[in-house]
Each structure stands twice: as structure tokens, then as C-alpha cells.
């Protein structure tokens, strides 16, 4: 199962010899998005050796009746791999009447959003606490430089959040004009 964006794989397998050594003994590769499948094929894997599948979402995240009880719109931004932090900062700065919950993961973004009074930064949290933050949000904001199948995307959809996503990588395998801006 390959679950990294192509640029991350390029760092580990920058030359063809290394790539071939690591992949020769593998019968099938499963990817969580078409962009990663295409990348592996362009690196030399036969098409019949690569299978595109989809990211699962745990039933625990299914939110049958999302209820929004707050006055101002609340946006949650999760997932720090390949996040477009510059664009996220611009969006936050340009929307002072919107409340943002930004998941930092293992990074400390406090100096980055120091002047933004509309931002709540949360560190890496357990799933139950993350689910609660998602339940309190109206919108899942996913500004990314690239993506393949993402637990952030599928859990946001399951939670009934409105979706705003960068049109990159394999995002259209999960989100399109019918469910995402």
C-alpha cells in the first residue's frame, strides 16, 4: 500500500536503480488515488501491477445529523502533510469574522498565527477529541499542495462538513463539484 504523495516518494527513490530494487519483489501496489497510480506507472511499473483503490472511513465518523449551533462560521483545517500554509494564512487573514480551528499536528504554528484572534490552534489530539472538533465545525478547509487518498477528506465527508479543497493530486477521486467547492 502506497500512501504518500509523489514528491515524497521522489525524495526516497530519486534514481531508477533504487526504485527498481525496492519494487521488483512486490506483486501488486495499492494506491489511494489516481495521481499516485499514474506516478508509479511513469516511474516504470507495469499498469497491471498498480491498483487504485479508495481510502476507508471508520463508521465512528458518520454524523447523520450535523447540527450547527454557533453564530459565526467555524472552519476546521486538518492534515499537515503537504498543507499549503501560505494560502491557509492568507485565507485566515482575509476572513476575520470566521472562526478557525487549525490542527497543528506535531508542528507549532503559534508564531505563524500570533496576530489572528479568530484562530484556535490545537496540537496533535486523540481521535475522539478530533471528532469533537469536527462536530463543532461547519466547513473542512483543505488547502494542499498535493494529495492522495486522505483520512482528513473522508472523515470530513462522513461528518457532513461542507468541503473546500485545493484541486490537486487525487482530490477528484473523493471530492467533485457535487460535494465540494
Task: Cite the ranges covered by each PLM segment.
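Short hydrophobic faces within alpha-helices
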Residues: 156-157, 164
Amino acid at each position: 500500500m502506497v500512501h504518500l504523495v509523489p514528491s515524497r516518494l521522489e525524495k526516497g527513490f530519486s534514481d531508477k536503480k533504487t526504485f527498481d530494487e525496492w519494487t521488483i519483489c512486490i506483486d501488486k501496489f495499492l494506491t489511494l488515488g489516481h495521481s499516485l497510480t499514474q506516478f508509479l506507472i511513469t516511474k516504470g511499473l507495469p499498469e497491471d501491477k498498480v491498483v487504485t483503490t479508495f481510502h476507508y472511513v471508520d463508521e465512528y465518523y458518520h454524523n447523520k445529523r450535523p447540527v450547527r449551533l454557533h453564530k459565526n462560521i467555524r472552519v476546521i483545517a486538518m492534515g499537515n502533510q503537504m498543507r499549503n500554509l501560505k494560502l491557509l494564512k492568507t485565507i485566515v487573514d482575509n476572513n476575520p469574522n470566521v472562526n478557525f480551528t487549525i490542527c497543528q499536528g506535531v508542528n507549532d504554528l503559534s508564531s505563524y498565527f500570533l496576530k489572528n484572534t479568530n484562530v484556535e490552534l490545537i496540537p496533535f489530539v486523540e481521535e475522539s477529541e478530533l471528532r469533537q472538533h469536527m462536530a463543532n465545525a461547519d466547513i473542512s478547509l483543505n488547502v494542499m499542495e498535493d494529495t492522495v487518498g486522505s483520512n482528513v477528506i473522508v472523515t470530513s465527508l462522513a461528518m457532513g462538513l461542507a468541503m473546500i479543497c485545493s484541486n490537486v493530486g487525487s482530490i477528484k477521486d473523493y471530492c467533485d463539484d457535487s460535494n465540494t467547492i
